[in-house]
Amino acid sequence: MKITTKVLIIGSGPAGLSAAIYTARAALKPILINGMQPGGQLTITTDVENYPGFAETVQGPWLMEQMYMQAKNVGTEIVSDYVEKVDLSKRPFKVFTGAGNEYDAESIIICTGAEAKWLGIASEQKFRGFGVSACATCDGFFFKNQEIVVVGGGNSAVEEALYLTNHANKVTIVHRRDSFRAEKILQDRLFKNSKISVIWDHVVDEIVGSNKPKSVTGVKIQNVHTKEISLLNCSGVFIAIGHAPNTGLFTGQIVMDDDNYIITKSGTTRTSVEGVFAAGDVQDKIYRQAVTAAGTGCMAALEAEKFLNK
């Protein structure tokens, strides 16, 4: 089936739903395709304490449900489907979905987000949200005066470790190589911090913990040379081996940086294609917060409205 719309929003995290709320209130009758993971990364986040407007801790899935209902109540058409292919060569832009529909859109707001890269071991999945995290800013507070392990060796790992010293008693970085890839200035700060220690030439073999209540108690790490396995006690494990934006759909059609994040014009959400906007983590490799994603979703909506009214 072919469907036409003034505004098509791809993605249903804080950026996409914020864009939907604003475009719906502007009477643009947006259609939002919610994607393979409706609600985005917050749907796998347990406690949220840093989203403005809530004096008490809220659950990530609950917060996304509220945004979803708000977007729907103001007139957004939300479609349970996912995008398989796009054609941004001319307007109206064409978007093809898994359900076999074709959407012809006068403007598109891309909110497909980014995903943390994970180790890919079963125990990591088991304890995700119960001691295993990929966001120190989001979850560091829960490990006050505890011992934490950070996995990685680039800028992300060093920055996460430095941040976590604001909360933890001790932070141990486990890195598979014998040196960091992080910037020299970050390494200097790390080595001067008495709360941080480094275990070189090791990888995480298994994350261990308790089921009642579900919580992390340590990690088994393996020496990459000797294959010897040892146990490192900790209460939390932060995976910091990078993020990957969900931009594969747009390769070759829109300008991206070397890490495949969509490039937007400074201070805006405008992309290299007129009429196509990008909001949230898909164009933000620095902050990656729910509140900043929602903010750029609002920006994209206002810019799309202005574009359509030209």
Curated annotation (Swiss-Prot):
Stretch forming the signal peptide: none
Alphabetized SUPFAM superfamilies for the sequence: FAD/NAD(P)-binding domain
Keywords: Cytoplasm, Disulfide bond, FAD, Flavoprotein, NADP, Oxidoreductase, Redox-active center
GO BP term, example: removal of superoxide radicals
InterPro entries found in the cross-reference section: FAD/NAD-bd_sf, FAD/NAD-binding_dom, Ferredoxin-NADP_redctase_2, Pyr_nucl-diS_OxRdtase_2_AS, Thioredox_Rdtase
Localization per Swiss-Prot or TrEMBL: Cytoplasm
Annotated FAD binding sites: 34-41, 281-290
One GO location term (cellular component): cytoplasm
Molecular function GO terms recorded: thioredoxin-disulfide reductase (NADPH) activity
NCBIfam families with a match to the protein in the record: TRX_reduct
Miscellaneous: The active site is a redox-active disulfide bond.
Name of this protein: Thioredoxin reductase
